[in-house]
């Protein structure tokens, strides 16, 4: 049934993209009481959408919600029913396999209620001002899903019937529809009602009819607005700025007015859309001139950038132009033949080509603007990089929603449902075209392939030299990476690749152009989560890295010259320098061959993931060193697989002659054999790293200066040595001098022998070690060591506990400060400790007087006192002074020295002089002594009865 349409002053029936299909967008955007105002608001809303989308280029996090709100409103309607309107080719669901269920599966639905509505349609000549009313009862209707007018974007749908306009009535022009806009709307408002009885007409889809999603062609402003939505959304898909959107508005208004005139203009709309895509690309170039350095710095690179990003697009646009020219002829003939099927197929073909073209335009132009906005916002490059890169998927989703503004489900399906095929197809197309266009970039930017290779050596080494030498080429590399990012969405390694390369490039641009305006401290590197918190000197280090790379690896050569005095270190740095150059070239080949070879893509992904895991855009030189085995495989550099808790896993094999791992217990040397130089048996590496690490404070400091490749202060000086060998202009002299000083003796030759190693190796039990453990005590003739008596073990345990508690209090006082109570407590514990030590020494002096026979007479106590007993909780009312006992009054056992016993016993020293166990043992001995004395008194005179007392004492 027809539902009563609300006031058309707020919803234009002439808006081909509004009404039942785009009513959420209209409810969100149009709230005025005049049709012209509503159309103007449509234009304003489209311009606002363009502004939001252009703001998405700058602040994706801030305006993604706006785009998602506006686009989700259109998304519900676009997924409900594509509107195959002639004035909106981009708003059609043009996938041939995804036709509307209402159009295909249920062609014979019957409209329950029909009203007699006079719809004004002009006659054959497009310039004739006359128009005759056609009753709507003569127009067949079809029941389709529609969404009622509501301000919410709910997906509840009811069924209603819509008129189907015969193609015999020629589509009016925009100038003719202006005067008839209000008449149409008023007639529709007066005739459409819920309660009006209507006749039932059987509807069927003949080849003489075309289904029009909205009722009639209304005012000239609203189709222009719809096409402005299309073209603006095309510009939004291309992420153009406001200038490009305005250009598209101006060009598309002309095209839209011609679109209404004739079916040829409909097909010209495709051509115009393609031209608008080209204009969008040109406007993107203008925007690139404002957002980046492409047009400003290098016009040739700008043209080559268009060739890079839009070579597929231009080829596709040419193909689409030729296809559209065929469509112009064929489509016009099909309209004369009045074939709906052919028209849909024609539209599907056009829109498939258009959507493929838009996919290419979207990917490439969006990458252009994405990177160029990064280059534009170099003052806030971390924020924009984080927003843009963290929201790569969000931007793609926003682009899908922007395409939903176009109601182009085919384009969305090309991005989502056909991601396996379409994205791979784009990937293969980008394989061919990006490589060719990248070579065009090389010739256009550098005009020299050798120069291009040099720029690659600078670019991928730290991407800074590439930015300074040719910012346009840097943007082209970003476009390649972002093409991988958008086209290869199912490869997260490529996306990490783009994280690294984009942030490296823009971050290095930021350093080169602005010298760290807001990148000091923790905000220095957006991905360097490990080095930021510990490295306040990251700024100097990475700035010097950029200077090194801007000097075409002169710093690495300087390292080679500084370490030239040491032969072994010379070979090491030579390997590093060679590996850096090879990695630079290989990474540029990975830029050239990211889309040519999947194996190279995997290697590039491994390298870039290692860049994320190892250095996170701080030490690209050193990451190239660590990742050299992934690219070259046999350069002899070790990435030293870390097994520490804080280090990130690296999968490169350890075939290095140098392994700077000091603690092989925590840092395994990978897959090296015991005989290989990287094995734990090769203590050359351990010794020199111990010297470089512990004796060389510059190495430790420089390791903290932004060059901790996950060292984590655990003694792994692999990357510290690499960094110190190739680090900074400020630190090269110190590090290289220290390396030379420390390594002239240790690394004088690569074939040092084992006795030379042992001379400098820190012994475990030696004097140079941090912990000295005596193996066997030095025995003198005058002194002999006695074992600890069982009765004295408790005393030694308590001495240990007291000393530990004193040390803990001292440590806490260093960090948290000390109070008078803590000082008094430490003093009291110290006096207790001294008293206990004195008692033990007295007992040891007594025990040394006894021989073995006398010692055997003293048995250990049968029961052992518990060390820790539960004590009663002190009363809260007691003053704190009574809690602390005077240490002079503390009792201790004169036999074993313990201070904790359940009961004190009488001993030879008086009452409460023995603990419970010793007192009981003493009592048994006294009983035995008394019994023996009684026996002896009967036979012999009494002897001394103080044997037990002497033994106990």
From Swiss-Prot:
The answer to whether keyword S-adenosyl-L-methionine applies is no
Q: What is the lineage of its organism?
A: Eukaryota, Amoebozoa, Evosea, Eumycetozoa, Dictyostelia
Q: In terms of domain of life, where is this protein from?
A: Eukaryota
Signal sequence span per UniProt?
none
What protein is this chain from? GATA zinc finger domain-containing protein 14
Q: Does the keyword Zinc-finger apply?
A: yes
Tell me one GO biological process term. Answer: regulation of DNA-templated transcription
State the InterPro entries in the record: GATA_ZnFinger_Domain, Znf_GATA
Quote the biased-composition stretches of kind Polar residues, using this chain's numbering. 1-21, 90-109
Residue spans, zinc finger GATA-type:
893-918
- The gene for this chain is gtaN
According to its UniProt entry, this protein's organism is Dictyostelium discoideum (Social amoeba)
Where do the segments described as Disordered lie? 1-109, 216-756, 934-953
């Amino acid at each position: 049934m027809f539902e009563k349409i609300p006031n058309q002053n707020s919803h234009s029936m002439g808006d081909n993209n509004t009404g039942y299909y785009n009513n959420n967008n209209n409810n969100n955007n149009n709230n005025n009481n005049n049709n012209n105002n509503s159309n103007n608001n449509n234009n304003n809303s489209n311009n606002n959408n363009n502004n939001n989308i252009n703001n998405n280029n700058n602040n994706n996090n801030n305006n993604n919600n706006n785009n998602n709100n506006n686009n989700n409103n259109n998304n519900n309607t676009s997924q409900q029913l594509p509107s195959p309107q002639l004035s909106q080719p981009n708003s059609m669901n043009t996938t041939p396999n995804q036709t509307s269920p209402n159009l295909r599966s249920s062609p014979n639905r019957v409209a329950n209620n029909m009203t007699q509505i006079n719809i004004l349609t002009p006659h054959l000549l497009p310039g004739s001002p006359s128009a005759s009313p056609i009753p709507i009862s003569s127009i067949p209707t079809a029941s389709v899903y529609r969404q009622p007018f509501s301000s919410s974007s709910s997906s509840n749908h009811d069924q209603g019937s819509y008129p189907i306009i015969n193609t015999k009535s020629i589509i009016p022009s925009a100038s003719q529809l202006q005067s008839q806009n209000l008449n149409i709307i008023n007639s529709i408002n007066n005739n459409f009602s819920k309660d009006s009885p209507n006749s039932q007409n059987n509807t069927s889809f003949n080849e003489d009819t075309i289904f029009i999603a909205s009722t009639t062609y209304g005012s000239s402003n609203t189709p222009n607005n719809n096409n402005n939505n299309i073209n603006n959304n095309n510009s939004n898909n291309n992420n153009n700025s406001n200038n490009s959107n305005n250009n598209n508005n101006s060009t598309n208004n002309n095209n839209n007015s011609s679109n209404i005139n004739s079916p040829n203009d409909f097909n010209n709309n495709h051509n115009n859309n393609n031209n608008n895509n080209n204009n969008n690309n040109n406007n993107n170039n203008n925007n690139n001139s404002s957002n980046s350095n492409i047009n400003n710095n290098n016009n040739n690179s700008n043209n080559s950038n268009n060739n890079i990003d839009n070579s597929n697009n231009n080829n596709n646009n040419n193909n689409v132009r030729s296809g559209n020219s065929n469509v112009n002829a064929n489509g016009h003939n099909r309209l004369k033949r009045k074939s709906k099927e052919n028209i849909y197929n024609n539209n599907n073909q056009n829109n498939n080509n258009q959507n493929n073209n838009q996919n290419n335009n979207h990917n490439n132009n969006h990458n252009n603007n994405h990177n160029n906005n990064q280059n534009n916002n170099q003052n806030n490059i971390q924020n924009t990089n984080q927003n843009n890169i963290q929201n790569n998927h969000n931007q793609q989703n926003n682009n899908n929603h922007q395409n939903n503004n176009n109601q182009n489900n085919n384009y969305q399906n090309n991005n989502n449902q056909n991601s396996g095929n379409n994205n791979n197809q784009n990937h293969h197309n980008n394989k061919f075209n990006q490589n060719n266009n990248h070579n065009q970039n090389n010739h256009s930017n550098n005009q020299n392939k050798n120069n291009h290779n040099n720029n690659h050596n600078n670019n991928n080494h730290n991407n800074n030299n590439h930015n300074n030498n040719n910012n346009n080429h840097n943007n082209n590399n970003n476009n390649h990476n972002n093409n991988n990012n958008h086209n290869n969405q199912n490869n997260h390694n490529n996306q990490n690749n783009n994280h690294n390369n984009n942030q490296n490039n823009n971050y290095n641009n930021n350093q080169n152009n602005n010298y760290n305006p807001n990148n000091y401290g923790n905000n220095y590197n957006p991905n360097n989560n490990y080095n930021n918190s510990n490295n306040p000197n990251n700024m100097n280090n990475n700035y010097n890295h950029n200077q090194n790379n801007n000097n075409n690896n002169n710093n690495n050569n300087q390292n080679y010259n500084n370490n030239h005095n040491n032969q072994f270190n010379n070979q090491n740095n030579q390997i590093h320098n060679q590996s850096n150059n090879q990695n630079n070239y290989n990474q540029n080949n990975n830029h050239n061959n990211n889309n040519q070879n999947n194996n190279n893509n995997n290697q590039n992904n491994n390298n870039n993931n290692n860049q994320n895991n190892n250095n996170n855009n701080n030490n690209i030189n050193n990451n190239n060193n660590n990742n050299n085995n992934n690219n070259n495989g046999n350069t002899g550099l070790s990435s030293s697989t870390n097994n520490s808790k804080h280090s990130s896993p690296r999968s490169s094999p350890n075939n290095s002659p140098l392994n700077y791992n000091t603690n092989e217990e925590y840092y395994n040397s990978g897959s090296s054999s015991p005989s290989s130089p990287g094995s734990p048996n090769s203590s050359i590496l351990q010794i020199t790293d111990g010297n470089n690490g512990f004796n060389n404070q510059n190495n430790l400091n420089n390791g903290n200066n932004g060059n901790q490749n996950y060292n984590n202060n655990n003694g792994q000086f692999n990357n510290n040595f690499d960094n110190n060998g190739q680090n900074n202009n400020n630190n090269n002299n110190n590090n290289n001098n220290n390396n030379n000083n420390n390594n002239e003796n240790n690394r004088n030759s690569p074939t040092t022998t084992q006795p030379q190693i042992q001379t400098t190796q820190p012994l475990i039990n030696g004097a140079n070690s941090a912990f000295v453990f005596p193996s066997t005590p030095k025995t003198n003739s005058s002194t002999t060591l006695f074992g600890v008596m069982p009765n004295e073990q408790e005393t030694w345990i308590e001495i240990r506990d007291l000393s530990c508690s004193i040390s803990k209090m001292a440590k806490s006082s260093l960090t948290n400060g000390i109070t008078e109570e803590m000082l008094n407590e430490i003093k009291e514990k110290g006096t207790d400790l001294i008293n206990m030590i004195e008692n033990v020494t007295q007992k040891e002096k007594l025990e040394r007087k006894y021989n073995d026979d006398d010692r055997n007479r003293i048995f250990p106590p049968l029961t052992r006192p518990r060390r820790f007993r539960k004590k009663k909780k002190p009363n809260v009312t007691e003053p704190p002074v009574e809690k602390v006992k005077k240490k002079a009054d503390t009792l201790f056992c004169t036999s074993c020295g313990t201070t904790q016993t359940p009961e004190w016993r009488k001993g030879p020293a008086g009452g409460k002089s023995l603990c419970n166990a010793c007192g009981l043992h003493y009592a048994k001995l006294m009983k035995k002594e008394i019994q023996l004395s009684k026996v002896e008194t009967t036979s012999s005179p009494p002897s001394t009865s103080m044997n037990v007392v002497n033994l106990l004492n």
